Every structure is written in C-alpha cells, then in structure tokens.
Amino acid sequence: IESGANVVQLFESFAESMLKPFYEKWALPCHEKIFQNLNRDVPSILFAKEFSDLELMASSGAAALSVGNVVDLSEAIQQFPELIFQGNVDNRIIAEGDLDKISDATLNCLKQSEGKNHILNLSHGLLENTSLESVLHFINTSHSMRITNS
C-alpha cells in the first residue's frame, strides 16, 4: 500500500483441497490475522480457490470475496449483501475458445450479479492454453453489457 497498491488480495490457492474443519482450524485464523492488521481504509479481497463455504470466508474480515465455480453468485450476493464479490466466469470456458460459450458465460455471470457489488473476473486466472482471441472476446463481451444498480 505504501508503495502504491490500491487493494490487497490474499490468495489461498489450496483451499479447494481443504475440508471445512481443516480450513477453519488452520487457514481461517491466518486470514483473520492478516485482515485485522490491515488499515480498514485499504480494500481487501480473499481468494480461497474453489472453496464454497461463504460463511467462513466472510468471517475472515475481507471486504470482498473472490469466488469460483462452486459458488452461485446470485445466492452469495443475497446471503452477504454487505460484501463485494469477484468472479466467477469459468476459466476453462475461456480456454476452450468457443466464442458463443464465452459470451454466454460472461453475460450469465453479469446477470447473476445484477450489477450489485461485483467485480467481473475468472474463477481462477487464465489457463496456459487460452488464446488472446478468447481473452479479448471475454473483455469485449463484458464491455458490451452495462448493468446499473437500481
């Protein structure tokens, strides 16, 4: 932050391999400590890769949760309206390169969020075989649809 970052994102890349009790005992206390020690004015995001327990993730103290394909975005937003969500277009769809499927997945994600507290992103980064054409189509599709808060 002192060097110019605008947000802090904590990555828990092995979360998808953790059972809830393990996550709760070992990962969550670390997440809580990190977020508690951040200045409250600093936006923070928790990325717990493909972890579905939103209640545990929300208790971390992060202002935003990056969610993958295992989370229904519209339900997440209803359950935790005070949080911001990031995600959750399936990165495998982008990698496969079918432009119609990329459009459908992107628009579906945007519709699920209804323009509320959402940062459009992939479930977990670009896969190595993803073409530039697919990435550009994802970006252009997202720019073509504007959803405003009502």
Stretch-by-stretch model annotation:
Residues 1-150:
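Active-site loop segments of alpha/beta catalytic cores
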